[in-house]
Regions:
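Polar low-complexity intrinsically disordered regions
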Residues: 1-7, 337-342
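Interaction interfaces in information-processing and related assembly proteins
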Residues: 3-278
C-alpha cells in the first residue's frame, strides 16, 4: 500500500483550531529526513478502557500500549492485523492489543489484583514497575496463506517508550523516538461530572534519503581488539535536532483537545517546515461474534464442552470487549453420526 499523497503543508496552511480525536496524522519533515505519526485518542480509548473495571494504573498502562500499537501499526504498508503483546513477571502479567487496518482497535490486560493494589499502596505503580521483566512481541498478520512476522524486545523494568526505542535501535537500526501520554479528563455532563480517558502519542523516525547522512550510529560490536577503543559514528545533526524537539513535548500537548495535532507539529517543526498527510480514523471495535464463539466451542472435544456447563448453560465472555455469549449445551453439540440404513 503506497504512502498517501500530501494533503496540506504547514506553515502554508493555518492549523486546525481544535484537535480531531480518534485519528492518526502522518507527517514528514523533508529538510531533516524525518517521518512520523501523531495519534490523538478520545471516545475510542475511553470506550476500550471503560469496558473493564481496571485499576487506574493498569488502565493507564494499557492506554499507553494502545497508543504505541497504533503508532507502530499505522506505519506498515499492509492489510491485516498488527498485534502487540507483553508477557512479564510484574503485577501486570500480560497486555494484548490488536490493531486491524485501517483503524480498528481492541485491547485487554491480565494482572494480579493483589500485587497491583500493593504497588498502588506503596506508591510504586509506575509503568515499568507494573510491567517488570519479560518481553514485548510485535506480530504482523496479513491473513491466511501468509507468513507471520514477529519482532521481540526485552522488557527490563522500564516503560514502553524505552522498549520501543530499544527495539528500533537494535532490531531495525532506525533512529526512533516515541512519546506516549494517557490521562483521565473530568467532564461535566447532564447527570454530573464523569471521568473520560484521553490519550495521545508521537512517533518520529530518521529515514535519510541523502547518502551523506548517517542512518544510525554503529553499535559497539563487543569484539574490539585489546588496546583499541570503539569509536562510534556520531549522530547526524538532523536527527539530533529532531529528537531534541520531541523531548520538549509535554503530556498536556498530546492530550489537550484544544491543541490540534497540526498545531503541535507546527510548534515543533515550523522552522524546517513540516508536511502532513491525510489523516485516518480510529475506532474501538472488537472482532468477536456469537458465530465465532460458537465455532470456537465446537472445536473443543465433547468432554471439554461438558465441563464448561454451569447451571445448565455455557457462558463465554470476551476478554477484549467484555461481551458475554450464552449457549445451551445442545447448541454447540456436534450432531450424532447418521446410522446406515439397515435395508
Amino acid at each position: 500500500m503506497s504512502e498517501p499523497q500530501p494533503q496540506l503543508e504547514i506553515p502554508t496552511r493555518a492549523p486546525a483550531a481544535t484537535s480531531a480525536d480518534d485519528t492518526i496524522l502522518p507527517f514528514q519533515v523533508e529538510a531533516l529526513d524525518l517521518r512520523g505519526r501523531v495519534v490523538r485518542f478520545g471516545p475510542a480509548i475511553d470506550t476500550i478502557l471503560s469496558r473493564h473495571n481496571y485499576p487506574v494504573p493498569v488502565a493507564k498502562l494499557l492506554g499507553e500500549a494502545i497508543v504505541l500499537t497504533v503508532l507502530l501499526g499505522s506505519t506498515l504498508k499492509f492489510e491485516g492485523r498488527f498485534i502487540l503483546q507483553t508477557q512479564s513477571d510484574g503485577p501486570v502479567r500480560m497486555l494484548v492489543i490488536d490493531y486491524t487496518t485501517p483503524g480498528k482497535v481492541r485491547a485487554c490486560a491480565r494482572f494480579d489484583a493483589a500485587r497491583v493494589a500493593a504497588a498502588m499502596a506503596a506508591g510504586a505503580a509506575a509503568p515499568g514497575t507494573l510491567l517488570g521483566h519479560g518481553h514485548l512481541a510485535m506480530t504482523i498478520d496479513q491473513g491466511p496463506d501468509t507468513a507471520r512476522y514477529q519482532g521481540i524486545v526485552a522488557l527490563e523494568g522500564k516503560d514502553l517508550e524505552h522498549a520501543a526505542h530499544e527495539y528500533f535501535l537494535r532490531s531495525e537500526q532506525i533512529p526512533t523516538r516515541v512519546r506516549l501520554a494517557v490521562a483521565e479528563e473530568l467532564r461535566a455532563e447532564i447527570d454530573g461530572a464523569r471521568h473520560h480517558w484521553r490519550a495521545g502519542g508521537l512517533l518520529l523516525q530518521f529515514l535519510p534519503q541523502s547518502p551523506e547522512r548517517a542512518r544510525q550510529p554503529d553499535l559497539d560490536p563487543g569484539d574490539v581488539p585489546e588496546g583499541m577503543e570503539f569509536q562510534p559514528q556520531p549522530e547526524d545533526d538532523a536527527w539530533v535536532q529532531g529528537r531534541s524537539l520531541v523531548a520538549t513535548v509535554e503530556d498536556l500537548e498530546l492530550l489537550d483537545p484544544d491543541v490540534s495535532a497540526e498545531q503541535l507539529l507546527y510548534r515543533l517543526f515550523h522552522e524546517p517546515g513540516v508536511r502532513v498527510f491525510r489523516s485516518r480514523d480510529l475506532h474501538a471495535q472488537c472482532s468477536c461474534s456469537r458465530a465465532g464463539v460458537e465455532r470456537m466451542l465446537r472445536s473443543f472435544p465433547q468432554d471439554d464442552r461438558d465441563h464448561m456447563v454451569e447451571n445448565g448453560k455455557i457462558t463465554v465472555t470476551c476478554e477484549f470487549c467484555n461481551s458475554t455469549y450464552v449457549f445451551a449445551p445442545m447448541d454447540v453439540r456436534e450432531p450424532e453420526p447418521s446410522q446406515p440404513d439397515p435395508g
